[in-house]
Structures are given as structure tokens and as C-alpha cells.
């Protein structure tokens, strides 16, 4: 189960590799689902990153290892827990998203994230 104090891989080209989730802003529970807005602390970065280690950042969860039931027929699970870094106005920091994202993120009004990726599931 994905909850607070979980490490997330970053799936964009912002220069950050991993963040530690410290708060869920979408819900007031500990559980985290796809499409939730989270607050995290940077734990691992690239050498050329403009962001600094241990800064507080915002992110949107796009992939989880947990099984997701779609239309009561299909189960989807990904290989890792991933998020995309955004600013306070929900604009993405990176200019590309690596990997696939689910199509139902479009219904949650994350259209800017939806336009940066190539693969959908």
C-alpha cells in the first residue's frame, strides 16, 4: 500500500531522481492514489539539476505498484511508484515525461501533463 513516507521515482527530465512523500494534499488520509497531489522532499538528484537536495517540492502521482481495477474487468499495475514534479500552479517543471501514464488522468484536469507524454494506457 502506498502511503506517506514512501519514496517516488521522478518520471520527467527535471533532474531529480527520487523524492520522499511527506503529505497528501488531495485527501486528508494517509493513502495515496494515482492523480493525487503530494508534497515531497528531494532525496536524490542528478549532477546537472537546478533543484537542490532536501528542497520541498510538489508532485502528481502517475504510476503505482498497487493494482487498479478499471471498468470492473481489467487490473493495471506498474513496476514502480512514479510522480511528476509541478509548481504551485500545477505547471510541470520538466519538459518531457518518461514512460506511460493512465488515460483517466485527463478526467482529473491534468491536461498539461497529458500533452507532455507519448504513451498512454
From Swiss-Prot:
Major location category of this protein: plastid
Record note on quaternary structure: Part of the 50S ribosomal subunit.
Name of the protein: Large ribosomal subunit protein uL14c
Role, per record: Binds to 23S rRNA.
Gene Ontology CC terms, in alphabetical order: apicoplast; mitochondrial large ribosomal subunit
Subcellular location per the Swiss-Prot or TrEMBL entry: Plastid, Apicoplast
Domain of life of the native organism: Eukaryota
GO molecular function, one term: large ribosomal subunit rRNA binding
UniProt gene name: rpl14
Keywords attached to this entry: Apicoplast, Plastid, Ribonucleoprotein, Ribosomal protein, RNA-binding, rRNA-binding
Signal peptide extent: none
Family: Belongs to the universal ribosomal protein uL14 family.
One of the protein's GO biological processes: translation
Lipid biosynthesis is among the record's keywords: no
InterPro entries: Ribosomal_uL14, Ribosomal_uL14_sf
Record SUPFAM superfamilies: Ribosomal protein L14
One protein family per Pfam: Ribosomal_L14
